[in-house]
Amino acid sequence: MAFDKKLLDIVACPVCKGKLEYNKQDNQLICKFDKIAYPINDGIPVLLENKAEPLAE
């Protein structure tokens, strides 16, 4: 199942409440402010802080 980009208008980073960006290559939602990535499983974003991965610098 593909990620629906319309969700970007309504989802926010659970840590800072900021906007998220979609990374199609890695299938993740990125918070540039907190420098973390949230996985997307079967088209569903997993917006749990304990599931987020730090971004590579």
Curated annotation (Swiss-Prot):
Gene3D superfamilies: 2.20.25.10. It comes from the Bacteria. InterPro entries: Trm112-like. GO terms for cellular component: cytosol. Pfam families: Trm112p (PF03966). It comes from Shewanella piezotolerans (strain WP3 / JCM 13877). Belongs to the UPF0434 family. This is UPF0434 protein swp_2279. Signal peptide: none annotated.
